[in-house]
A protein has these predicted regions:
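Short alpha-helical transmembrane segments in multi-pass integral membrane proteins
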Residues: 1-15, 70-137, 181-236, 294-359, ...
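Transmembrane helical elements of multi-pass membrane transporters/channels
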Residues: 10-29, 133, 144, 167, ...
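Helix-terminus/linker motif at the lipid-water interface of multi-pass membrane proteins
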Residues: 24-43, 112-121, 177-184, 244-274, ...
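Small-residue-rich hydrophobic transmembrane alpha-helices
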Residues: 42-102, 144-153, 157, 268-326, ...
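Short runs within selected transmembrane alpha-helices of multi-pass transporters and secretion channels
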Residues: 63-67, 133-152, 160-171, 189-204, ...
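Flexible, glycine-/charge-rich segments associated with ATP-binding catalytic modules
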Residues: 441-459, 560-580
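Conserved short strand/loop->alpha-helix "switch" segment adjacent to the catalytic nucleotide/phosphoryl-transfer site
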Residues: 476-497
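Glycine-rich/acidic phosphate-handling loop/turn and adjacent ATP-lid/helix
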Residues: 527-552
Length: 580
């Protein structure tokens, strides 16, 4: 369990960074244009968000369902099928990206007229410039997200995090250069975003995706599968419906604030939505860690580890949500000034508005996470419920509020309706559960599965010889209690002893505070043993035959089915023994 937590943390950071990359880049763009162009330029950058939300429909439809299923097949050690899902997803995203890039360029005027309350003002002019450039680079954005996701599910989250860090730094550097020093205004900010996405695509392509380091081969035409596409779309349609509602929600938010709260209100909303988008994307990153790490654990039939991942993800999400809300509430005045508020009246108004609006964050993060938890469980009925409930509650509140309450109090509608949506989600989940006590409320995770009916042993062992030999005694006692031949139990213990010794010697664990996790499952047709460690990459199966020691020769002679993977920064060795 210790290494399950470590894998979760490792993936969570990388996934959160990759999902937040766009929101962080928008925040950087906003600060730069707000300070070096005008506050109206910041509002224009924020008005790009409905289109950005629309792009998430493509990711939810074609990328995330494919990655969750690929993660499951990687867990089952079926790399060919994982490659088929990824290749199918990539070809679909390439087609969608080309079409959307062309459409964004051609229909820029239509978008500006639709989204701006005053389509002849300064905000509309800034938005026209920003949208035409960034929208034309839609394909680059989709590819950057695709490559980050694939690197993460292939067990290299640190590489994805590195790519995102480089991308954000490039965006900051080119934002300052093009916008502040060369005076290109919002056009410079938009070009900096395209450059950052290009850097991400090139870096990940050259360092992992199309190299031998990738554990599966991507051949978009050879491995394209109609059946895989149908499976992706079946799951993706339920998820993408949620993004449609989210896009409508963002449109209504911008329209309502423009109508009720004038330019200062739109400026305050722009800052609030930047923080909101970063936090929601953080929750998406946590959710993707549930889908990928959890999907991998489900493939291994490790339900104990899966429940641990889900519980931890909920705690982390709520902690981040409340921490951000408290921090923004405390530093709202400084935040408003940082984004370029230039009069005392504007600072005072935006500070008060932001302190109320920000409490939408904890509820919205939990709502986002719940969608991914339902996706990981393949619960098609509940996948759309969280975001649809949230969007409908917010839209209804924003449209009705001015008729019953003063317009200046509109900001209170955001957190109150977000809380209402949590209640709606819980109510719907209880209706779907229909009194079934075998699954948990809200998350719908099974309290018990058929996979857990088999006898199994889970151990976390400190990487030292004393604890190693004590654990071998525990394993031997467990095997002796099972209805198997004594010889088979001795063979498994002998193999595990050899593996532990090799891990300590070659993976650099001994005396350094490391550990390894061991799972032994008494399955119907044999014994499955999984050994995980967090040392440096070490594959005993890759040792040349003439260089193998006696212990390794014995291990490979006794156990005919041995598989090695390096996933999420950990060595994973899987041994299968037949009862025959």
């Amino acid at each position: 369990m210790a290494l399950t937590t470590k894998a979760m943390n490792s993936f969570l950071v990388a996934a959160a960074l990759s999902t937040c990359a766009t929101a962080v880049n928008v925040a950087v763009d906003g600060i730069i244009v707000g300070r070096f162009v005008s506050p109206d330029a910041l509002s224009a950058v924020n008005l790009y968000s409905p289109y950005a939300q629309t792009l998430s429909i493509i990711l939810l439809l074609l990328l995330y369902p494919a990655s969750s299923q690929a993660a499951y097949f990687i867990g089952e050690r079926n790399r060919e099928k994982a490659g088929s899902y990824i290749s199918t997803s990539l070809l679909s995203i390439l087609v969608a990206g080309v079409l959307l890039s062309a459409a964004a360029f051609v229909f820029t005027d239509s978008y500006v007229n639709m989204i701006c309350y005053d389509d002849d003002g300064a905000i509309a002019l800034y938005l026209h410039t920003y949208f035409r450039i960034v929208g034309s680079g839609t394909l680059l954005f989709l590819l950057a997200q695709f490559f980050c996701e694939i690197v993460n599910i292939d067990g290299r989250p640190s590489l994805g995090a590195r790519a995102i860090a480089i991308s954000v730094l490039c965006n900051i550097a080119f934002d300052i250069l093009l916008t502040a020093h060369l005076g290109l205004g919002v056009a410079g900010s938009a070009m900096a975003t395209l450059i950052a996405n290009t850097v991400t695509v090139v870096f990940l392509s050259c360092s992992h995706i199309f190299t031998k380091a990738c554990s599966f081969t991507i051949r978009i035409f050879h491995q394209f599968s109609v059946s895989a596409l149908k499976s992706i779309l079946k799951l993706g349609v339920n998820m993408s419906v949620t993004s449609v509602f989210s896009a409508v929600f963002i449109f209504v938010v911008n329209f309502s604030v423009q109508k009720c709260c004038d330019e200062d209100g739109l400026f305050a909303l722009s800052i609030g939505m930047i923080v909101f988008n970063i936090c929601v994307n953080l929750a998406m990153g946590v959710g993707r860690s549930v889908v990928s790490v959890g999907g991998f654990l489900k493939g291994l039939r490790d339900w104990l580890g899966y429940r641990h991942v889900v519980t931890r993800s909920i705690r982390v999400t709520l902690l981040i949500g409340f921490a951000v809300s408290i921090a923004v509430m405390s530093g709202a005045r400084l935040l408003v000034r940082t984004f370029g508020a230039d009069t005392p009246e504007m600072v005072a108004y935006c500070t008060d508005a932001l302190r109320v609006f920000i409490w939408i964050v904890p509820s919205s993060m939990l709502v986002t996470l719940m969608m991914f938890i339902y996706q990981a469980m393949m619960n098609l009925r509940l996948i759309p419920v969280p975001t649809v409930a949230f969007s409908i509650a917010e839209i209804a509140a924003l449209l009705a509020w001015p008729y019953f309450m003063p317009s200046e109090t509109l900001w209170y509608a955001f957190p109150l309706s977000a809380l209402l949506s949590i209640g709606i989600i819980y109510l719907v989940s209880e209706i779907v559960r229909h009194g079934d006590n075998t699954i948990s409320g809200l998350t719908h995770i099974p309290g018990h599965t058929d996979d857990e009916d088999v006898e199994q042993l889970h151990l976390s062992i400190p990487a030292n010889k004393d604890d190693m030999y004590l654990s071998l005694k525990s394993i031997r006692a467990f095997l002796d209690s099972q209805d198997i031949s004594g010889g088979l139990g001795k063979k498994l213990v002998l193999c595990l002893e050899e593996i532990f010794l090799n891990i300590n010697e070659y993976a650099g664990l001994m005396g350094k505070g490391h550990c390894y996790d061991v799972i032994i499952r008494m399955e119907r047709d044999g014994i499955l043993s999984v050994v995980k460690d967090d040392g440096r990459p070490f594959n005993p199966l890759a040792v040349e035959e003439k260089k193998r020691g006696l212990g390794l020769e014995i291990l490979l002679g006794i156990c005919k089915h041995v598989d090695y993977q390096n996933m999420y920064g950990q060595n994973l060795l899987i041994l299968q023994f037949s009862y025959e």
